[in-house]
């Protein structure tokens, strides 16, 4: 691995050059940084990553940028300027992982495609994230999150399921950048796999990851049942969770998830419904008598509406039915369990003030990650990183005069 500023965590010593923008690549690299990698974010001089300006912002920096760029260093370089491209390739020669998320062909036209970077660093793990991948009829289509939610099945599978098991006609988007973040999860896992392959002597490689592929892979197991089993009659919804609805209580909302037979019968008892009917006893009998089961479920919703949240949850927990309350992000931040496990960390940012973010969810016993560090200001580390390459202050100033840094 390359020499990098030591951060604690299992990826300590790994250096990542992050040329990506928005959410997919930046979030993938943030996950690597959480685990100890030294991530150098390369941004456009004077403007930076577009994510700095999207959504809720304070002090000129968005919440999205803070969340996707924690634990990183920021360098400004413009590969459109020959001098900027030359310095970027010098950095690439000293990195383990190179990440970009532009349309196929963009990096090649700039002279920083895989072949260019491999020429200076044969063992590099070069990661290309795009909407549809490098080939196929959609390869050169532009793609943001909602485009991939539409193509990948997310929007269609969010249609409302009616009591009779049919769905309405209106597709719905998941109200967050779900396609971006799912892709980022696959990317961070694939990067660590490629680093392992390199560590055991298989060399570097070019890793392509299409957002469409990531969403399809993520969705297929539990939301595309009739496409997995191609010979079914299609009488059941493809998603076995599509009929789940939250319970409205007198003073709030909650959920019960009666997946196992004992849980379903416990749900009935918790809300005073007779659980002895033979049509309710097993998955098979409930599937056979779906209309009757729908009536039973509507009864549980009616009973629940007259209970307080505390009373309803207590009744469900007494029957050991998996259940919970619906919390907003603000509620979660104050939840006693979240506080007890240190789910969120707060730090100060010179422009945005107090910033609160979740820690990495994996807690490593022998290689623990350190506390989160704040997202960088635009170009905050340009001088120090370029000095590490051997550039003196006059050379760095010259790059700025040229618009290269």
Feature-to-residue mapping (PLM):
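Aromatic-enriched alpha-helical interface/lid elements that frame and gate functional surfaces
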Residues: 243-319, 323
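Substrate-binding/catalytic subdomain of NAD(P)-dependent oxidoreductase enzymes
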Residues: 192-234
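N-terminal helix-loop segment corresponding to the beta1-alpha1 unit
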Residues: 1-200, 230, 377, 383-405
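Short, surface-exposed loop/helix-turn segments at secondary-structure junctions
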Residues: 52-55, 225-234, 271, 335-349
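Glycine-rich beta-alpha junction loops
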Residues: 46, 132-133, 211-216, 251-253, ...
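Terminal low-complexity tails and localization/encapsulation signals of metabolic enzymes
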Residues: 1-15, 248-249, 331-405
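Conserved PLP cofactor-binding pocket of PLP-dependent enzymes
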Residues: 317-338
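A short glycine-threonine-serine/GTX helix/turn-capping micro-motif
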Residues: 171-182, 204-206, 234-244, 253-255, ...
